[in-house]
Amino acid sequence: MKYPDFTLENKLSGVIAGVDEVGRGPLAGPVISAAVVFIDRNTIIDGINDSKKLTPQCRQVLYEKITSVAKFGIGMASVEEINSYNILQATKLSMKRALIDLDLELDYVLVDGNQPPEVKWQVKSIVNGDNLSTSIAAASIVAKVTRDRLMQELHNKHPEYNWYKNKGYGTKEHLNAIGLYGITEHHRKNFAPISRAL
């Protein structure tokens, strides 16, 4: 398996943040972004990869390692903001907030995908960036673990939707629960399965 590395970061100079989001697709819960900066790019953390390729246990271990050696920021766009704008604009807002939370003077921002937020720093969009850049892959892990923990908290309040397992995604189980119990304030009302249930 090929792992991300610092090739992209090393082609640039200065302080470089990797940014990624988690939670664009679910029917419930916020979208979360993380920004990660490895000040020392000689830092080696074995196993960093796109969070979708890792087990939950592996993500937890890597999260602890990443957050102990790297600078990081977290940004969230709420369900209310997703409902008010749209998921793309809410995602950009969460990315911008993650960079603000990072609270560093940056030279470049590497963003996974091709729809970056408008920020004051130089931005490079990297399609499949979480497979290429260690900074972006690390951000994907931090964002994923952060959102999973939040969905666990929401699950404790609404166990009937089993968000602990489905993380708010539109699984058959989740859709069946919506049919049985209706929707909560944590559901995204402008997403088709939810808007049809209103």
Swiss-Prot record:
Manganese or magnesium. Binds 1 divalent metal ion per monomer in the absence of substrate. May bind a second metal ion after substrate binding. Gene3D superfamilies: Ribonuclease H-like superfamily/Ribonuclease H. It catalyses: Endonucleolytic cleavage to 5'-phosphomonoester. Its EC number is 3.1.26.4. Keywords: Cytoplasm, Endonuclease, Hydrolase, Manganese, Metal-binding, Nuclease. GO terms for cellular component: cytoplasm; ribonuclease H2 complex. It is found in: Cytoplasm. One of its GO terms (biological process) is mismatch repair. The keyword Transferase does not apply. Pfam families: RNase_HII. One of its GO terms (molecular function) is manganese ion binding. The keyword Magnesium does not apply. Its cofactor is Mn(2+); Mg(2+). Disulfide bonds: none annotated. Its main location: cytoplasm. InterPro entries: RNase_HII, RNase_HII/HIII, RNase_HII/HIII_dom, RNaseH-like_sf, RNaseH_sf. A divalent metal cation binds at residues 20-21, 112. It is an enzyme of class 3 (hydrolase). Residues 14-198 form the RNase H type-2 domain. Endonuclease that specifically degrades the RNA of RNA-DNA hybrids. Belongs to the RNase HII family. HAMAP family: RNase_HII_B. NCBIfam families: PRK00015.1-3 (NF000595). This is Ribonuclease HII. It comes from Wolbachia pipientis wMel. The gene is rnhB.
